[in-house]
Amino acid sequence: MKRMVFSMVLAFVTMVVYSQDIKGKWITEAGDAQVEIYESNGKWNGKIVWLQKGPDTKDTHNSNEKLRSRKLMGVNILFGLTKKKDKWEGGRIYNPKNGKDYKCSMWMDGDKLKVRGHLGIFYETQTWKRAQ
């Protein structure tokens, strides 16, 4: 009986901790890309690891003409976020659909990740789902 209770408590604690961890693969709100979020030197970043249009999709909207021929696969679109309490902030997010980058903050909402891009007083928030 003690073993069963311990196992249930351990499973619950693991689930709670895992649900608050942004590390891993996430499906964007549109479902057309998957981003892997990882920590490096105390900063959180995210790179594209899957695209619905395929791995050869180019960064055609980049404001830097020299980067328009690069493949989006593997490109960091989240960079430099720092965890502060229950939020990750102080970083940037690149939007390959328009070639612009924005200030970024993120937070967990249950098992979903809220990703917000800021431009001055304007912002847009997306809800990303954890990939299986």
Regions found by a protein language model. Give the residues of each.
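Central antiparallel beta-sheet cores of small beta-barrel/beta-sandwich binding domains
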Residues: 22-23, 29-31, 35-94, 102
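Short, solvent-exposed mixed-charge patches
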Residues: 131-132
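N-terminal helix-cap/turn-to-beta initiation motif at the start of protein domains
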Residues: 17-25, 123
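Positively charged n-region of N-terminal signal peptides that target proteins for export
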Residues: 1-4
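Short, exposed beta-strand-loop hairpins at the edges of beta-sheets
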Residues: 95-106, 112-124
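Hydrophobic h-region of N-terminal signal peptides that target proteins for export
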Residues: 10-18
